[in-house]
Each structure stands twice: as C-alpha cells, then as structure tokens.
Amino acid sequence: MSSFTPSPDHAGEFRQALGQFATGVTVVTAASDTGPIAMTVNSFTSVSLDPPLILWCPAHVSERHDAFVAASHFAIHVLKEDQTELARHFAMNGADFSPIDLIHGAHDVPLFEDCLARFECATHTVHRGGDHSIMIGEVLRVTLDPGAPLAFQAGHFGRFTPKS
C-alpha cells in the first residue's frame, strides 16, 4: 500500500485512488437554451430524506457545465446493468438522444423511460467545489423499476453481484 499527499504532482494517483470506490452510473438530463442535454455521472449521492435532496457534481471543464448549472430542473437516471453503451454515449455526446426513447417531463426536462430509477428534481442550490460544481436538487418525483444496476470501478463498467 502506498501513501501520498494529494497535489498536482500526484493527480493521476489521486484519481486512481478515487476510482477504487465502486459506484453506480447515472445520466443527468436537463432542458437548455439549445435543446435537451445529458451527461453521464457517477458523482451522485443522497443528501437528505427530509426534505428529499440529492447531489451530483459536474466538472467546470465540461462544455455542458454552464447549461446544467443554469437549469432550474433536471433528472437523474440510474442505469441498468445492460445500459453500458448508453453510459458511454452520454459521456461523450450530451445532445444526441437518438439511442433512447425519450419523453419530456415537467419544465421540458428530458426523461428516459427505461432506467432503474429516475429522480426528477428542482435545482435547490449550487456550490463551488474546487474544479467541480456541487448541484443539490430537491427531488419532486421518483420512478422506480426492478432490476440490477450498472456499476463502475477503476475506469471499467461492470455489474454488482450481491453476496447471500
């Protein structure tokens, strides 16, 4: 086991250490001045049950960052284990919704019909967090579908295998 102090000289190692934490995979969507936008995100977590709050963190360097920060509403879609290609697609292209059946929810937010869970949110607050923004959303509606989640760890997609 190695140890280091996070610094620009150790940025790659710091990122590698963060990648050891296995997460689920989400796609965040919103309406923007130029049309619907999306972004694959694994920086998603619950904040509060009462009121129902969640957060996610877009990078400042993302060309979609400013549009998401300006959005009054957004949706977070938790992907199913068979949606790896969808995760890859929206990691690279945030405006092409051709691979998915899309409906529009309140405030014209684009919604995926096929996902494990969907959280429709109003933007509650946005904080600066280093090279990312921390977007906190108040959850207005939840849609839940049974199934298994898509997982992500150390730069690779996979599946979660529960232990009995």
Indicate where each model-derived feature is located.
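Basic, polyanion-binding surface patches
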Residues: 1-164
